[in-house]
């Protein structure tokens, strides 16, 4: 099944919260997730000239703000992070940013999806052409929600998978290799264990 870009939010078997963002793509497969600094992971084209072909293929997919991790499928990562820096509650930062940015104005009206994760709470959100939703979710060890731009743009217990891996690297590989979801390109994970751990593949 092809679900495009998606987020996986859950806990490892050991109970460590994580979020993984995976790029799955038919149109722009030549991209990489790159750790830019201690607080940022970006999605970049391998050929920088591709940046001029589509405004939606280059963006920060992960931002860390203190004890808060933000992961999304687009430039709204930075907007959410900025609002959290200003002191907005997570729900409000998500709501404001998604409503302000709206869905992507591409040929597919691609939804914007987002996750905000702390040690004690986890939020998921999206804005599509026909809907907007923010939801606080409870995480269970060894399980994870997934939220995608195509086919699975919902926040529901029906969109839960079992996840293997103890480290950020292992979780990233698991999500990249997850065969049910086609066309993997690159992925990035933030895992919370004695602070945030970043990994890309």
From Swiss-Prot:
**Which pathway features in its UniProt record?**
Purine metabolism; IMP biosynthesis via de novo pathway; IMP from 5-formamido-1-(5-phospho-D-ribosyl)imidazole-4-carboxamide: step 1/1
GO BP annotations listed: 'de novo' IMP biosynthetic process
This enzyme catalyses: IMP + H2O = 5-formamido-1-(5-phospho-D-ribosyl)imidazole-4-carboxamide
Q: Pfam families of this UniProt entry?
A: IMP_cyclohyd (PF07826)
Gene3D superfamilies membership = Inosine monophosphate cyclohydrolase-like
Keyword Lyase on entry: no
Alphabetically list the UniProt keywords: Hydrolase, Purine biosynthesis
Top-level class of the enzyme under EC nomenclature: hydrolase
Which domain of life does the UniProt lineage start with?
A: Archaea
Query: What GO molecular function terms would the record report?
Result: IMP cyclohydrolase activity
Report the EC number(s), separated by commas if there are several.
3.5.4.10
- Function description: Catalyzes the cyclization of 5-formylamidoimidazole-4-carboxamide ribonucleotide to IMP.
Family according to the record: Belongs to the archaeal IMP cyclohydrolase family.
- This one is known as IMP cyclohydrolase
């Amino acid at each position: 099944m092809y679900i495009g870009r998606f987020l996986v939010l859950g806990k490892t078997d050991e109970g460590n919260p994580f979020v993984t963002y995976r790029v799955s793509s038919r149109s722009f497969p030549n991209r990489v997730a790159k750790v830019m600094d201690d607080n940022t992971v970006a999605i970049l084209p391998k050929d920088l000239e591709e940046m001029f072909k589509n405004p939606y293929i280059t963006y920060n997919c992960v931002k860390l703000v203190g004890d808060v991790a933000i992961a999304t499928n687009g430039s709204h990562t930075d907007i959410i992070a900025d609002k959290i820096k200003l002191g907005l509650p997570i729900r409000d930062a998500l709501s404001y940013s998604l409503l302000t940015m709206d869905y992507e104005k591409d040929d597919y009206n691609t939804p914007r999806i987002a996750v905000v994760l702390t040690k004690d709470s986890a939020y998921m959100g999206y804005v599509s052409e026909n809907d907007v939703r923010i939801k606080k979710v409870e995480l269970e060890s060894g399980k994870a929600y997934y939220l995608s731009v195509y086919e699975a743009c919902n926040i529901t217990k029906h969109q839960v998978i079992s996840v293997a891996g103890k480290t950020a690297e292992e979780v990233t590989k698991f999500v990249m290799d997850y065969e049910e979801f086609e066309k993997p390109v690159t992925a990035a994970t933030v895992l919370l264990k004695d602070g945030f751990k970043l990994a890309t593949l």
